[in-house]
């Protein structure tokens, strides 16, 4: 089996956009809160986001079991389920929704936009492509959060240094995930600079992963992962097949390296979630958010 040889953690930049219910004075603050956490899939990076999010809230004096009630729901990487969860949390009139991963962020925002419920997202690769911000990076409504945009050029540079003779690099991605489509476009713009040819393989569900992996592995010298929820949830299958063919697989964050990817230039998702939790605490406490702007 392949062994972990390298991991470089790159902290993501927080993206702050107008969000949340503002109050004119401290007397309007609630003493306790109910929030919904909608997570698109269960895998290491998103689980770490959730863990960090709750730690960030706790650092700001909002602690589950004390003055915080959490309604956690997981969509199991299914868009239809994500919509049901979003609608349910809005129906429950939670004080805030934390949406983890791009599909859940889109679903939560669409459900909450007319209900005056703020949405704080995390692990969203490209808020503009996901239509959570406009083309200038300005907020589109009651939504803000943090981005886990991939350091694509650093990843390509690392792969080239580790595999000087590799020619074809493969990427599997979910065609319905805006974050993945955006990342693919960035890879396309940079692969030639590092003397690679990009081979893409699109899928729609986890059921496609096994055959897609077989096809991709027959055409490439290595594979690099995105922060694609459907693919990452099926990563053990891809790694097993890649190990049989002795084809290295590069991850996009530390949890993927822990389970067998060769290396990654990626993000500390606990720290990302923690930063998001601190942002959520400010919204819950009624801090005036109108001065917040979306950073690049």
Feature roles, as predicted:
Residues 35, 53, 144-191, 292-296:
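An alpha-beta-alpha
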Residues 282-296:
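Hinge/cleft segment of the Venus flytrap/periplasmic-binding protein
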Residues 1-34, 59-63:
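Short, low-complexity disordered leader/linker segments with a strong preference
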Residues 69-91, 202-216:
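Structural motif
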Residues 172, 178-253:
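Pocket-lining segment of extracytoplasmic ligand-binding domains
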């Amino acid at each position: 089996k392949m062994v972990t040889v390298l991991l470089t953690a790159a902290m993501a930049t927080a993206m702050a956009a107008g969000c949340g219910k503002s109050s004119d004075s401290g007397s309007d603050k609630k003493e306790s809160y109910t929030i919904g956490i909608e997570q698109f899939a269960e895998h290491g990076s998103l689980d770490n986001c959730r863990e960090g999010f709750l730690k960030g809230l706790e650092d700001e004096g909002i602690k589950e079991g004390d003055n915080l009630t959490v309604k956690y729901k997981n969509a199991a990487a299914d868009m239809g389920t994500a919509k049901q969860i979003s609608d349910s949390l809005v129906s429950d009139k939670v004080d805030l929704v934390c949406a983890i991963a791009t599909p859940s962020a889109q679903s939560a925002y669409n459900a909450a936009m007319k209900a005056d419920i703020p949405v704080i997202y995390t692990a969203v690769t490209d808020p503009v492509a996901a239509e959570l911000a406009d083309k200038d990076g300005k907020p589109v409504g009651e939504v803000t959060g943090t981005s886990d945009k991939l350091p694509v050029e650093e990843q390509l540079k690392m792969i080239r240094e580790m595999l000087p003779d590799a020619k074809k690099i493969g990427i599997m991605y979910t065609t319905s995930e805006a974050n993945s489509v955006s990342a693919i476009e960035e890879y396309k713009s940079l692969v030639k600079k590092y003397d690679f040819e990009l081979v893409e393989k699109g899928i729609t569900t986890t059921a496609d992963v096994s055959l897609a992996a077989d096809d991709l592995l027959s055409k490439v010298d290595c594979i690099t992962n995105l922060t694609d929820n459907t693919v990452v949830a099926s990563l053990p299958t891809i790694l097993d097949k890649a190990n049989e063919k002795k084809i290295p697989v590069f991850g996009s964050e530390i949890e993927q390296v822990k389970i067998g990817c060769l290396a990654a230039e990626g993000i500390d998702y606990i720290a990302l979630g923690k930063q998001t939790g601190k942002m959520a605490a400010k919204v819950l406490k009624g801090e005036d958010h109108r001065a917040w702007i979306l950073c690049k």
